[in-house]
Amino acid sequence: MKNVLPPFIEIYRALIATPSISATEESLDQSNASLITLLAGWFSDLGFNVEVQPVPGTRNKFNMLASTGHGAGGLLLTGHTDTVPFDDGRWTRDPFTLTEHDNKLYGLGTADMKGFFAFILDALRDVDVTKLKKPLYILATADEETSMAGARYFSETTALRPDCAIIGEPTSLQPIRAHKGHISNVVRVLGQSGHSSDPARGVNAIELMHDAIGHIMQLRDSLKTRYHYEAFTVPYPTLNLGHIHGGDASNRICACCELHMDIRPLPGMTLNDLNGLLNDALAPVSERWPGRLTVAELHPPIPGYECPPDHQLVEVVEKLLGTKTDVVNYCTEAPFMQTLCPTLVLGPGSINQAHQPDEYLETRFIKPTRELITQVVHHFCWH
């Protein structure tokens, strides 16, 4: 099988050279179809059955599932095909040209996280996948950097139930078994415009929002004292006020005001619970000013995630790597994969390079990542 695929570095180079930017702004958003076609071809060459799945509600985005083997269980290796947009003025290299310098591989997606697929392909090039005793699945998803639509759709529609899954996000090969969720909301206040010389003839939306923010701050303090998870560096749910806008002139009573905020819940906290807490916090304002305050989602929510610490996957990976699993504050697709099977987040490269100009992956990760993928495939698909 070894001559079927291009060399590792050429696979990497081709992945980086194929743009697949996800953005909420339509002018920046790109289809991942070309990248999916590349991956589908390579996994087909290795003997996998390949299914390409359009993702509803996206701008021409696709998931790809490559599978081999029969029966129940097995292993799912998964990652996203998209990258964030890049700031051309801050990059000193071409983001779409893989450049090796000073023991680093530079390019958009080298760490986050197109490179993971190059590692999978390279680790499997000498494996006769038709002889695996349990199924092996490779999932490439769309739109992780914006809506996570690909992972959401796959988890809602697939009948697959592997024994376990590994998401190859850049964790510096530190296995992650839990992370916080993310909920982003917009609070809107509708006032009544009027001339500032007669405040009684209007309803000032900024003043109502000031009242609302006071209640939101009380909720923030309550979250900090009521919920605790010691393993996290920030061991409580955080609440952040990120953006506010209201009014258009100093001599006009403000007619509308809008606040963008987010909450990062701990694993185990349900999205319904958090929505209820926010609505309860704002209830005094809503009752005093009926019909003038609304709360809506800015983006689809992401629940917190946790893999049981005593699961076989945790035990096996900790033994292979000689290190304990950890928890992180950022989000991945793990909550959606966890609905299918126990899931770890584990991959080459540093999260500190994600979304940064001159993104890179250190070459010191190449050998241990290849070895790790080989070992987990052997353990979960050969035994």
Curated annotation (Swiss-Prot):
CDD domains documented for this protein: M20_ArgE (cd03894)
Entry binding sites for Zn(2+) 1: H80, D112, E169
Biochemical pathway: Amino-acid biosynthesis; L-arginine biosynthesis; L-ornithine from N(2)-acetyl-L-ornithine (linear): step 1/1
Record-level Gene Ontology MF annotations: acetylornithine deacetylase activity; zinc ion binding
Gene3D superfamilies membership: 3.30.70.360, Zn peptidases
Membrane-crossing residue ranges in chain numbering: none
Superkingdom, taxonomy of origin: Bacteria
Keyword entries, A-Z: Amino-acid biosynthesis, Arginine biosynthesis, Cobalt, Cytoplasm, Hydrolase, Metal-binding, Zinc
GO annotation terms (biological process): L-arginine biosynthetic process
Binding site for Zn(2+) 2: D112, E145, H355
Active site: D82, E144
Gene Ontology CC: cytoplasm
UniProt-listed SUPFAM superfamilies: Bacterial exopeptidase dimerisation domain, Zn-dependent exopeptidases
Requisite cofactors: Zn(2+); Co(2+); glutathione
Enzyme class, broadest EC rank: hydrolase
EC number: 3.5.1.16
Subunit architecture: Homodimer.
Known function: Catalyzes the hydrolysis of the amide bond of N(2)-acetylated L-amino acids. Cleaves the acetyl group from N-acetyl-L-ornithine to form L-ornithine, an intermediate in L-arginine biosynthesis pathway, and a branchpoint in the synthesis of polyamines.
Protein family according to the UniProt entry: Belongs to the peptidase M20A family. ArgE subfamily.
Protein name per UniProt: Acetylornithine deacetylase
Organism in which the protein naturally occurs: Salmonella heidelberg (strain SL476)
